[in-house]
């Protein structure tokens, strides 16, 4: 059955989900032309801006039949541009993208020819990917290749940020005036950075020009199409598009329709300027749109149906944009088409009052009706949120496709204030990507990569030696067979952790400098607060707040592993360290009795058992203390968050067996969720265990829970879901999300994938088509503990 409330959006949705993801070579060609023309003659920020402007002036424009919101990243829906200045793919990369079984991108023969003859020769030695790898120390490279951590900027650009309200108050002509005024104020006598500021500001002004051109070109194209159109209804739509593009993005929006189109033009601009990770995000969309909605309804030019239709059109636009193609380790850490555009709904308003409004409910209806993996939608639940809103969100969630996710507004505000933000800015913040918090429109909060915490224990148990890569990756902290206490083991673990965090942050500092020098983003700098005022590009610390995150992975696995060692080796003395190490080396073959002890007769995290939960707290605090507060190149600080995307699969693949009974190469635990099968006391025990982590010290945590459909059916099931969310959030939990499915359905989908093309599940901080997941990830989701109330 076609989904969509209106015939228009039913058609657009079907076209979107059936469009083949493909490589769009056009951006690479136009950027190459611009670099050949301008490189060496202007400062790099201006080079970036002129290249972006050249791209905007010459790129293909797409207005798809029936749509009301216009703009694509590629040449057509599901076209993925490439970014050779950041990552110049090899011909082998293109072959892999074209032929791999999942997350594949069609690459035409023409695109391959152009890439081989024009793109690779120019960009091979210019790409930042090579600059980064070549600048890394042998220790960093060894740790990276061993899977101790990942690096987001290896194929993507920093730029994880969220849209604030600037674009709804000012058009790009207004922003250009602000930039020109700031240029006149530069003090070259007393400000040693004035020359760099001049280049940054001039680049921002050029980026504003480019955005004005983008709107003008779309207005002209829509009018041209209207002149040729014989269908009166379609002609009317095209003229409306033209009138809308006459206003935005050059000027501030005046209507609900214009506000949506304004955001979308900015989204397309920011995500084609650089392939930022994660994609640019609307943030508090209901808060931004509601004033336009109320005014238009009052003026009689908008009703609820039309407002929903326009948002359904926007949902299709998000779904038309696959994440930039990835290869190698970067694909393993985020194996999905989704680019993590995340919409926050609900929460509180700037005055601290309930933020739920009519647009909030419209957004819930849109996500329910459209059922698309992009955008990823969440609800912020505060103590002031109406129960009606929470239950409507739960009603959608229990349908089984993983949206919306649930976030604790009070926790988000406290997390941001803990990190030094003002309460006014914190109230306007929220979550993006998977679960990460930030002050929307005011903060550059860049994810730098995942940290494999269980593998740090693996190094500790092998005196710094990695049994998988057969290399000395860590430092020598002693033979664990000689440790006389659990405390001695944990001290050794903390030393390995300190060493690995040092390596990671040392590399990050180099990468930040490379990106600031070679990959400024003048367009994004125009819309992030304080960049214009400071005269500094986003990449140089122009934003009001500059945060860097290192995401911890596998807290459930390492908690149960250290618990197993403390309980069985040191406290109960059921076996010694030497026997355990031999069992791990043998993948427990021949050591089934030990496997049974650690798997079934040892305290586990996720059961409200203080024995295990206190160890979780120790591990978390060690990680927090190592990372949080370290300075960044841009004048901000490092923080931690706890999420995996799909990295828990990769991290497990490059590990041997773990002391908790996890077998060699099997996934480690995801988010802050307990190890699969370890949580046996129900969902209330799970949230009690998870709440013992101090979420307020983080920038986000991710908790998955799984139910069978029968458990959450009816009014009682709905109340149980809502009450679980409220209970967890009353304990300061950050986030919870639900998978609701029949295990047998997923097993059948593995056997007959052609019959389950529309099956969607929750993976980590996002939902995805079951058929787009690797078999290992499918098995991991199927194996998650099925909870009952």
UniProtKB/Swiss-Prot annotation:
**Positions annotated as active site in the UniProt record:** 434 (cysteine radical intermediate), 436 (proton acceptor)
| Gene3D superfamilies on file | 3.20.70.20
Residues with Glycine radical modification: 765
Question: Which residues belong to any copy of the Glycine radical domain?
Answer: 670-789
Domain called PFL: residue spans? 7-663
The EC class name is lyase
Q: Which UniProt keywords apply?
A: Lyase, Organic radical
What EC number(s) would the UniProt record show? 4.2.1.172
Cellular-component GO terms for this entry: cytosol
Query: Its domain of life?
Result: Bacteria
Which Pfam families does the record associate with it? Gly_radical, PFL-like
Any one GO MF term held by the record is: carbon-oxygen lyase activity
Posttranslational modification: Requires the activating protein PflE to generate the key active site glycyl radical on Gly-765 that is involved in catalysis.
Please provide the Gene Ontology terms (biological process) for this protein: 4-hydroxyproline metabolic process; proline salvage
Query: What NCBIfam families would the database entry show?
Result: glycl_HYPD (NF043068)
Q: What family, per the record?
A: Belongs to the glycyl radical enzyme (GRE) family. HYPD subfamily.
Its function, per the record, reads:
Glycine radical enzyme that catalyzes the dehydration of the non-proteinogenic amino acid trans-4-hydroxy-L-proline (Hyp) to produce delta(1)-pyrroline-5-carboxylate (P5C). Is involved in the anaerobic degradation of 4-hydroxyproline.
Name of protein: Trans-4-hydroxy-L-proline dehydratase
Instruction: Recall the taxonomic lineage recorded for the source organism.
Output: Bacteria, Bacillati, Bacillota, Clostridia, Peptostreptococcales
